[in-house]
Amino acid sequence: MIVIGRSIVHPYITNEYEPFANEKQQILSIMAGNQEIYSFRTSGELSFDLNLRVNIITSALELFQSGFQFRTFQQSFCNPQYWKRTSLGGFELLPNIPPSIAIQDIFKNGKLYGTECATAMIIIFYKALLALYEEETFNRLFANLLLYTWDYDQDLKLITKTGGDLVPGDLVYFKNPQVNPATIEWQGENTIYLGNFFFYGHGVGVKTKEEIIYALNERRVPYAFISAFLTDTITRIDSRLMSYHASPSTPQTSIGFIPIRDDAIVATVGNTTTVY
């Protein structure tokens, strides 16, 4: 269900020729048909969320095709022109290097980088926002970047919730409870849901849910009897908050609305939204 202000609406793309129109319409249809409530104050916030999701998907595919390597933190490496490898295996931005340039280098020179899947997901999020922000804004918000597991800049606002419906552009986690300790890095896989039943995970590539579960099961202890599984934990960029920094020149998606109800009372507690 999609709510704009106090109106429950069924949105649709009005310009079929705009970039990724079909993908955006699919996302809107999924959100409108889900039981989960997606609440926005304005149509502009919905447009930002839609474009952010598309850019998360395209950034995930770009990273997959970049040559970016899968390595444990003990074996991680990065381009020393822009980053310093920390003692824990993270990537610390060098002084006087614009974050926008350093993030783009990961996608241009992926073979010069290697790390685990959680860090890859954060890199994808930064790249998606860079597509929607002026470089000056991005560099101001995300100065002194450190890329290491789930450590991320405090100005990157994320929402993690348990339960809810899967939408393309969501970050979801596959858990492998009986992983072989010799390959502990396969205890789970952070992935971006690409839509059409496919996920991207750094290390497994672009695969279906069943294929990712199979890959994780192959890395369990001998005689394991518990299968890997897709958890119900979903992580998203808080698009309502992050839309404040969007570039005025960012093209807005043309969205029309079929009104369903215009007197909804919306209440949000934590990350749960209810409509009365």
UniProtKB/Swiss-Prot annotation:
Transmembrane segments: none annotated. It catalyses: L-glutaminyl-[protein] + L-lysyl-[protein] = [protein]-L-lysyl-N(6)-5-L-glutamyl-[protein] + NH4(+). Its EC number is 2.3.2.13. Keywords: Acyltransferase, Sporulation, Transferase. GO terms for molecular function: protein-glutamine gamma-glutamyltransferase activity. GO terms for biological process: sporulation resulting in formation of a cellular spore. It is an enzyme of class 2 (transferase). Pfam families: TGL (PF20085). Probably plays a role in the assembly of the spore coat proteins by catalyzing epsilon-(gamma-glutamyl)lysine cross-links. HAMAP family: Tgl (MF_00727). Belongs to the bacillus TGase family. NCBIfam families: PRK03187.1. This is Protein-glutamine gamma-glutamyltransferase. It comes from Bacillus cereus (strain AH187). The gene is tgl.
